[in-house]
Amino acid sequence: MLDLYRRTVARFPLGSVSYMFAYGSGVKQQEGYGKVGNGNNLRPPPGTVVDLVFCVRDARGFHAENLHRHPDHYSALRHLGPNFVAKYQERLGAGVYCNTLVPLPDVGITIKYGVVSQEELLEDLLDWRHLYLAGRLHKPVTNLVNPSDNPPLKAALERNLVSALQVALLLLPEKFTAYGLFHTIAGLSYKGDFRMIFGENKQKVHNIVSPQINDFFALYQPSLGQLSDYVAVNMKGQEPGSRKPAIIFEQDKSSSATCQHLRQLPRELQKRLQRNAACRGDYTQVVNHLSMASQLPEVLQASVNDIVWRSSVTQSIKNIPSAGILKSLAYSYRKAQKTFAV
């Protein structure tokens, strides 16, 4: 593990941590930010925050030990004790407890970290109940505690990527570029996010995808292999409207292929499709109708947006007490600045 991450992670109680990852502009290169260092020179760009997520088997135990070690990381909610903090984490919003804008002077960075129970993360990855952390994990991240020795979690992470790819295929035309594919995937968890109205750079998805095409390829190679009967690299061409070289994919857009993708969608997305489709009936009937409907991409995108909108609103409201008013205002100001970034 790189020294910066090692020194950062070592201060936290890791006994119940089954998975941990870092993400965001402080970790992965994004357009519009300074260069992220690599190797032994790893250093977040100036002004960025390193985002961390701890997946824990025992939320109460983690918070009890973390409160003992780092009471200053928590807002006034710390005075209510670890039982309350764990329940607040698990019962509200998207099931994540966030400590925001935590300075680590000894390593010279600022972090934001979320804590989620393994059970909650598994449900989000498999069912897209919130499409919150599942959406974060549609994009390249840096694993700090690897889930390789946790078969259920490893399988759920893989299934989440296949689901994202299947949704993207349903949204895309018969032929599309690699950039178009990964832009569609990365946008799934942003298009319905209310923070995109005023709290994020409107070019965020492009800024994530453009410098990370190779990382996206590496992340989705196994999923593309699983769906090789339905999608394949067809040729090398050009990005639409430019002379830039591009890898072109071609997919099977037959009704049988569409039905296959629709049948395998995450459970929460299936529920949303049933509500939003013009056809009324059980999910099998909805699938048969949508597989031949020209409105499928619009209905599917609206259904994804429904999930993301709800979780982004409830989790953002939940984060205000967990961060504290001053930190919430400071964090919101940082985010609002991105809205007006050129």
Swiss-Prot record:
UniProt GO molecular function: phosphatidate cytidylyltransferase activity
Compartments where found: Mitochondrion inner membrane
Keyword entries, A-Z: Lipid biosynthesis, Lipid metabolism, Magnesium, Membrane, Mitochondrion, Mitochondrion inner membrane, Nucleotidyltransferase, Phospholipid biosynthesis, Phospholipid metabolism, Transferase
EC annotation from Swiss-Prot or TrEMBL: 2.7.7.41
Catalysed reactions, as listed in the record: a 1,2-diacyl-sn-glycero-3-phosphate + CTP + H(+) = a CDP-1,2-diacyl-sn-glycerol + diphosphate
A Pfam cross-reference name: Tam41_Mmp37
Cofactor note: Magnesium. Also active with cobalt or copper.
Stretch forming the signal peptide: none
Protein name in UniProt: Phosphatidate cytidylyltransferase, mitochondrial
Main location per the UniProt record: mitochondrion
Domain of life: Eukaryota
Species in which this protein is naturally found: Drosophila melanogaster (Fruit fly)
Cited PANTHER family: PHOSPHATIDATE CYTIDYLYLTRANSFERASE, MITOCHONDRIAL (PTHR13619:SF0)
GO biological process, any: cardiolipin biosynthetic process
Role according to the record: Catalyzes the formation of CDP-diacylglycerol (CDP-DAG) from phosphatidic acid (PA) in the mitochondrial inner membrane. Required for the biosynthesis of the dimeric phospholipid cardiolipin, which stabilizes supercomplexes of the mitochondrial respiratory chain in the mitochondrial inner membrane.
Cofactor needs: Mg(2+); Co(2+); Cu(2+)
GO cellular component terms given for this protein: mitochondrial inner membrane; mitochondrion
Keyword Phosphoprotein: no
Membrane topology: Peripheral membrane protein
